[in-house]
Amino acid sequence: MSKKAIKGYINLIIPAAGATPAPPIGPALGQRKVNIAAFCKDFNDATNGMEKGVPLPTVITVYEDSSFSFKVKTPPASYFLKKYAKITKGSSATKKEAMVGKVTIDDCREIAKLKISDLNTKNIEAATKIICGSAASMGLEVVGN
């Protein structure tokens, strides 16, 4: 049995159980002649058990026959960091000028455990450092050892 020929990939961030034919999903899929309603139904069914509105990076593989498959990844690190720090948005200023909140190193380690499948490392300590770097870029102070 031969594999289907891949026409392309679409990378989108879609809210959990919130796929609709409206932009950006509809136009992105429509350009590649994918059945938009079928994708929205399949995606919403696949993410139905998750908290509504959680942003999910999704990679949609489009095949030559206009069929598709998709892979849902874990939410972005910034989503978890904002949740742990109890803030709605990161700092718009440079790192040292305006810290908008605090997270502990243990919080970063917990996030790293959730995100390790999507990071470019399998070492939990390296993954923790990646998450701490994201926190610093958002204007969050990392406290603890």
Curated annotation (Swiss-Prot):
SUPFAM superfamilies documented for this protein: Ribosomal L11/L12e N-terminal domain, Ribosomal protein L11, C-terminal domain
PROSITE patterns per UniProt: RIBOSOMAL_L11 (PS00359)
PTM remark: One or more lysine residues are methylated.
Pfam families assigned to the protein according to its UniProt record, in alphabetical order: Ribosomal_L11 (PF00298), Ribosomal_L11_N (PF03946)
GO molecular function: large ribosomal subunit rRNA binding; structural constituent of ribosome
InterPro entries: Ribosomal_uL11, Ribosomal_uL11_bac-typ, Ribosomal_uL11_C, Ribosomal_uL11_C_sf, Ribosomal_uL11_CS, Ribosomal_uL11_N, Ribosomal_uL11_N_sf
Domain of life: Bacteria
A Gene Ontology cellular-component term: cytosolic large ribosomal subunit
Gene3D superfamilies: Ribosomal protein L11, C-terminal domain, Ribosomal protein L11/L12, N-terminal domain
GO BP: translation
Keywords assigned: Methylation, Ribonucleoprotein, Ribosomal protein, RNA-binding, rRNA-binding
UniProt function note: Forms part of the ribosomal stalk which helps the ribosome interact with GTP-bound translation factors.
Quaternary structure, from the entry: Part of the ribosomal stalk of the 50S ribosomal subunit. Interacts with L10 and the large rRNA to form the base of the stalk. L10 forms an elongated spine to which L12 dimers bind in a sequential fashion forming a multimeric L10(L12)X complex.
Family that this chain belongs to: Belongs to the universal ribosomal protein uL11 family.
Protein name as catalogued: Large ribosomal subunit protein uL11
